[in-house]
Structure formats: C-alpha cells, structure tokens
Regions:
Chain A
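Non-transmembrane, aqueous-exposed alpha-helical and coiled segments at domain scale
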Residues: 1-348
C-alpha cells in the first residue's frame, strides 16, 4: 500500500516530546498514548487492506467523515496491535449507524459509553477477555480496542468532554468497555447469530450505548427462575421506562444453573421482560413519570423495554462466583439502539 | 532516541458557508413556530414563551411542532412546514 498519508506531520526529538505534544494538543484521554508514526499507522491500514483515504464511516450530524487513516492513527495511539484493527473499524461502523444515533449517546448529559461485545472466532484468536475480571484491566485487546473507538470519537468527531460531550457523570467505561462472549463454555446461541443471523464462524461486534454495569448476587437458587428472579428484582427498581436496551451478562455459575433447567436465551429474555414491569403508580411516585397517582395507576403496568428482543443476553464473566450483572442502555428506543456489525477480516 | 515524525489524529472541520436569515427588527405581526423536543415540560415552557411573544412583543400567532426525540434535529416535515407557515422559530431544550 503506497497511497499517501495526508495527515499533518509533526517532527519531534524523541518519545517524551511526542507525548508532550499529544497532551498539549488535547489528543489523549488522559493516559499516555503511543506516538503514531507512519510505519505503525501503515501496519494498521495493511491489517484491514484499506487505503488511507477510504471512508470508514460518516457522522451525519457532525458532517464528519471518518477515514481509515484517522482510525489507524488513533488505534496506534490507543495501543492496538494491527490485528485488532478490523474490530475497531467494525465498532466505528456501528456507532455511525443511524440506528445507534451518534449525536445522542456521544453528547448527552446521560453519559453513555460504547459497550462493545465481540463475538466469533476473532475474539478467541485475539485474546479478548470473556471470563474472570470481565471488565477489569489486564487484557490488551479489551483495553485498547475500546480506547481506540473513544479516541476516534474525541479526535475525529470532536466528542470532547466539556465541549460537545456534556455528560453529567460520564463513567469509567468511557476509557474502554469491551467484552467478548464466552462462546467456548456458553450453552446458548451466540449474540451475533441471534441478532443478525451470522454463522457461528463469522465474527461481529455489537455496540450499545450503555451505562455502568450493575452486579447482583444469588448464591441460594438452584433454578433458572430463582437466579433470574433476583436479577429482575435488581433491574426493576433502578429502571426507567422507555430505555432502548438492557444487556444481561450471565457469568459461569448462573450460566450453568440456568442452562441446567433447559432455558434458552429466548426463555431468559421472556422471563426478564415479564418480571421487570412496574406499575404506573410506582413510576409516578418515584418521579419517573409526571402527574398525580390515579387509582387505575396501581394496576396499570409498563415494561422496562418495548420487546423481549431489546434485552441482549450474553454469557460472560468469571467461572466462579454467584454473580451476574445487567447493563442499562441509554435514553429511549427512538434515540439509540444496539447495532451488530460483521467484522470484515482481510482474506489471506 | 533519534527524532521522528508523528501524525495528527484529528481532522479539520469541513468548512461550509452558512447563511442565516436576518433577525427581524420586531416580532410585531410575526408568526412564531415553536419546536418542542419531547422532554418533560418542554411543551409547557415553549407555550409560555409563545404567550409572552404574543402578549409582550406583538407576535400574531404561535404554533408548535414536536420532534421525534430530543437527540435528533427537527425532522424534515417540521422544517418544510415551518418554511411555509411561520416567520420565526424558537427551539428549546432543557435538562
């Protein structure tokens, strides 16, 4: 690949000056970055077979085209290996999809992060963590792919805290928020196969505008309904009507308990959908809906999401521990929805 | 370490000329459009603004549209309708 890289170049004396320049220009997320040299950027582009000026995505509301060159530069800065580049590109395609609705999750006071779920053989080949310490530091793929997406949002699209990003709290997932599904041990159909009809041998990423994970504990139940009953009780009360998606992440012990009862992911979704409704009276008393409580509000109920299919069920997390978690989506169904994108790997 | 070059990760925003309609000197007799963004009470706030623009500034009328949701620009039907039916638009968002 010899097409010219058109980005402006800055000569530096060494690593420290490069780092100082990146900080002074506001190009980092606060952590040090890898200096994006041309050879490193070329290696990223080669990994996806894209010319520097190829358009990866277009953010309509910002009228910004995201070129392969800029994705590659930011992926280098984030610390990605070139092999991760197809995953970064697919995630960028996902957040530029009109269904994801970039402007809202990127800008809102509601502080969504880009939850990124990797499925398929690429997850295992590149050592994306799907097990112990699922969201913790220590795995280069999880740490740097999410960081690369965030740096693209910052440096290319202008999603900068305090300016176009007005999050009230933000959350730690805005550094990186990436997991893989534990397909090797899961008894269930993988997420990408369920959502867009991929073959299990395909790889894909699912991006969801997401708040922080909320963990629950159930060490007592030996049944699917028992475990999920605790989940539903935990989900119901912090929930708000109209959220677009929830992601439910079932870790090893709960996964095995639920599967032993023969429940599929569809069964899990249906149970959660039916057991997380709240009364209109509850929503009004807790100021999630306007208006005075009327007698009929005590029996009128609302679900947390519009459809059971809006609940993403993922098998991931440590093998030990009677914990699982759920992750609320951001805002409303008309504002943003999870998007699954096939990862295009360069054929050898 | 020898000197080397690094590449700029940012993009220059694409510049495009934007022409604003001149603000009217007065709202007297003007037709007011109010674009409501679906957030709680945004309709009430804009209704109140519409009343103030009529009673205190002499606007002729005020009508309201509702966006699909608060995170997107006003949809095309609103823009097309507003072009035909009002002279001034007030859009509001509040958190």
């Amino acid at each position: 690949m010899t097409a010219r890289i058109s980005s402006q170049r800055y000569a530096v004396e060494g690593f420290q000056e490069a780092l100082d320049l990146c900080y002074s220009r506001g190009w980092t997320d606060g952590l040090p970055v890898v200096p994006p040299t041309e050879p490193a950027v070329r290696a990223m582009l080669d990994a996806v077979g894209l010319e520097p000026d190829a358009q990866v995505a277009f953010i309509t509301n910002r009228q910004v085209a995201i070129s392969a060159e800029k994705v590659a530069i930011n992926a280098v800065m984030a610390g990605c290996r070139p092999e991760y580049m197809p995953v970064v590109v697919a995630a960028i395609e996902g957040i530029a999809d009109p269904r994801w609705g970039y402007h809202g999750p990127a800008t809102s006071t509601g502080s969504a992060a880009v939850l990124t779920i990797v499925n398929g053989p690429i997850a295992r080949r590149l050592d994306f963590n799907s097990g112990d310490n699922l969201f913790a530091p220590g795995w280069r793929a999880n740490a740097t792919v999410g960081r690369a997406v965030r740096l693209v949002m910052r440096n290319v699209v202008g999603t900068i805290p305090g300016r176009l990003d007005r999050g009230t709290f933000g959350h730690p997932g805005r550094y990186t928020y990436v997991m893989a599904e534990n397909e090797a041990e899961s008894p269930w159909t993988p997420l990408h196969v369920e959502r867009i009809g991929c073959r299990p041998t395909d790889s894909a990423v699912t991006v969801m505008a997401a708040l922080a994970p909320i963990q629950f504990y159930n060490q007592l139940s030996s049944t699917a309904a028992g475990v999920l009953g605790t989940l539903c009780d935990t989900m119901r009360y912090p929930g708000q009507i109209g959220q677009p998606n929830y992601c439910v992440v079932l870790a090893g012990e709960h996964m095995r308990t639920i599967a032993a009862d023969g429940w599929s992911k569809a069964d899990i979704r249906k149970f959660i959908f039916e057991n997380t409704t709240n009364t209109v009276a509850h929503f009004k008393r807790t100021a999630r809906m306007p208006g005075a409580v009327k007698p009929e509000d005590e029996t009128a109920t609302r679900p947390l999401v519009q459809s059971p299919d809006d609940i993403l069920v993922v098998a991931a997390g440590g093998r030990a521990g009677s914990f699982s978690c759920f992750i609320p989506g951001w805002a409303s169904r008309t504002s943003s929805e999870a998007v699954t994108v096939v990862i295009k790997e360069r054929s050898a | 370490m020898a000197g080397f070059e690094i590449l700029d990760p940012t993009v220059e925003p694409r510049r495009q000329p934007l022409t604003y309609v001149p603000r009217p000197d007065s709202l007297k007799g003007k037709r007011i459009g109010l674009v409501e963004n679906t957030k709680f009470n945004s309709d009430k706030l804009l209704q109140r603004i519409g009343i103030i623009l009529k009673t205190e500034y002499g606007a002729a009328e005020a009508r309201m549209w509702r966006k699909h949701n608060s995170s997107v620009p006003a949809h095309q039907e609103i823009i097309d309708d507003a072009k035909q039916t009002v002279d001034v638009v007030v859009a509001g968002i509040g958190d």
